[in-house]
């Protein structure tokens, strides 16, 4: 079974509270999302391998550690996932960025794919799939299905807020994918929205309805 890592850092929880507030506008919402994604990046990349290198400080030569050339890819689920990309890329500037376009049918709540553009060497990369919301889990499962069909082998999922139902759905179909969240919320309501959640992340991010 995959692990679920809830990042309870005080700064993340503070910024998430501001994002939940219905009076927070799109500009602040975007900035907070970028900041939280960057802070979550420290936990998500905790297991990246290191190697020793020889360097020379202003004082003397020494052995020190650098990331061991691991190839990374960040894959946002469009469109809300775009809001998490800049924060992670600021930590991992060499990472490639692909895109998976899915929307949730309002009647069936099932994901519908409309776009997919991935790095050609996707099978050689450690992948971080990002989406602020993990609600029913349908979009995340569909995105991971698609990535695996393209050869992806090492995948993590990063969300701001998740419903227990969404976590269970991802683990049901992809028990090899670890899930990183800022908060596991209470449940889904009858419309498939996370309670208490933060509303429609895409609409709040881009100022649309």
From Swiss-Prot:
Co-factor binding details: Binds 1 Mg(2+) ion per subunit. The magnesium is bound as Mg-PRPP.
Source species of the chain: Clostridioides difficile (strain 630) (Peptoclostridium difficile)
Cofactor annotation: Mg(2+)
Single GO term (MF): magnesium ion binding
Function: Catalyzes the conversion of uracil and 5-phospho-alpha-D-ribose 1-diphosphate (PRPP) to UMP and diphosphate.
Family as reported in the entry's similarity comment: Belongs to the UPRTase family.
The protein's annotated pathway: Pyrimidine metabolism; UMP biosynthesis via salvage pathway; UMP from uracil: step 1/1
Gene it is expressed from: upp
Protein name: Uracil phosphoribosyltransferase
């Amino acid at each position: 079974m995959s692990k679920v890592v809830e990042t309870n850092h005080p700064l993340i929880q503070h910024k998430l509270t501001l994002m939940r507030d219905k009076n927070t506008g799109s500009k602040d919402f975007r900035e907070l999302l970028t900041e939280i994604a960057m802070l979550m990046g420290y936990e998500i990349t905790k297991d990246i391998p290191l190697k020793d290198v020889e360097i020379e400080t202003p004082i003397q030569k020494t052995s020190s550690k650098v990331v061991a050339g691991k190839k990374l890819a960040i894959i946002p689920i469009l469109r809300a996932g775009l809001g998490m990309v800049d924060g992670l890329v600021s930590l991992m500037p060499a990472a490639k960025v692909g895109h998976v376009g899915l929307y949730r049918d309002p009647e069936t709540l099932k994901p519908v794919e409309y776009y997919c553009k991935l790095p050609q060497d996707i099978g050689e990369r450690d992948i971080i799939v990002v989406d602020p919301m993990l609600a029913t889990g349908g979009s995340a499962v569909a995105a991971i299905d698609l990535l695996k069909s393209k050869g992806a082998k090492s995948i993590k999922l990063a969300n701001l807020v998740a419903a227990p139902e969404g976590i269970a759905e991802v683990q049901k179909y992809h028990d090899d994918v670890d899930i990183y969240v800022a908060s596991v919320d209470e449940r889904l309501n009858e419309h498939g929205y996370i309670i208490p959640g933060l509303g429609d992340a895409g609409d709040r991010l881009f100022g649309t309805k």
